[in-house]
Design a protein with these regions (language model features):
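C-terminal motif of bacterial Sec signal peptides marking the signal peptidase cleavage site
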Residues: 16-19
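Bacterial N-terminal signal peptides that target proteins for export
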Residues: 1-10
Length: 244
């Protein structure tokens, strides 16, 4: 009799424990939140940190398209990693690495860089193109750049870069204040295909821009940048500092 009672008690306790483990509302293993620093899914990391500026599918955003094989062909992993980890000085691109004040670990930075290349790069896209180099240590000449601009760019952006029927102004103070010289160079070389802007080969049919043309146009654009960008405020009624 005692044995039977013991068996029944044990069975009842087991049933109770099983019921508790599957009670409605009890969190499952899949419900456990992931610590942000442990997220290693490219889609999640890109969506949370990159899509806002570069577009949800790598194009169509305010910043340069990452889903551009031409851009990825001239910008190597060192360039991508440095930009992602440390940001780009003189632009709106922030630093994302924890070592630079951001929120992402080194591993997460690597996931983003590798994911961008695996998803959007095409290894042979510039096989026979001989593009201008991503960066240049030789400064361009603004005077020559004005002539090169007129030849290669004015048909879309208008005389003096102030905007035309096909494209807007590229000498706008706010625009130039958001881009450093390297970003200007990158755009001149790879264009903005997501916005209809051609790369260095497509401005004049059959006549690609030379490396010197690229450097000179960048120098001319940079020379249009205001030293202290911003709205000019009226001085009417402004205090002279005199005590009255």
């Amino acid at each position: 009799m005692k044995f039977r009672v013991l068996v029944l008690a044990t069975a009842g306790l087991s049933a109770l424990l099983c019921a508790c483990s599957s009670a409605p509302g009890r969190p499952t293993a899949g419900d456990t939140p992931i610590v942000p620093s442990e997220i290693t899914d490219f889609n999640v990391l890109y969506g949370q940190n990159c899509a806002g500026c570069h577009g949800s599918d790598g194009k169509g955003g305010a910043a340069i398209a990452l889903a551009d094989p031409v851009y990825l062909a001239i910008a190597d992993d060192t360039v991508l990693r440095h930009a992602t980890a440390d940001g780009i000085s003189g632009t709106s691109m922030p630093a994302f690495a924890q070592s630079a004040g951001g929120m992402l670990t080194d591993k997460q930075i690597d996931v983003i860089v590798q994911g961008i290349r695996q998803r959007w790069a095409q290894s042979d896209i510039l096989r026979d193109a001989n593009p201008p180099s991503y960066s240049s240590s030789e400064p361009g000449d603004p005077s020559r750049g004005s002539l090169a601009y007129a030849q290669f760019c004015s048909s879309c952006h208008g005389a003096g870069g102030r905007g035309g029927q096909k494209a807007g102004s590229i000498v706008d103070g706010s625009f130039l204040a958001l881009l450093n010289d390297q970003e200007l160079r990158t755009i001149v070389i790879v264009g903005r295909p997501d916005l209809g802007a051609p790369d260095w080969r497509g401005n004049v049919p059959g006549k690609p821009m030379s490396p010197q043309d690229v450097s000179d146009v960048v120098a001319w654009l940079a020379s249009q940048r205001a030293k202290f960008p911003g709205q000019p405020y009226s001085t009417a009624g402004k205090s002279t500092g005199e005590v009255r």
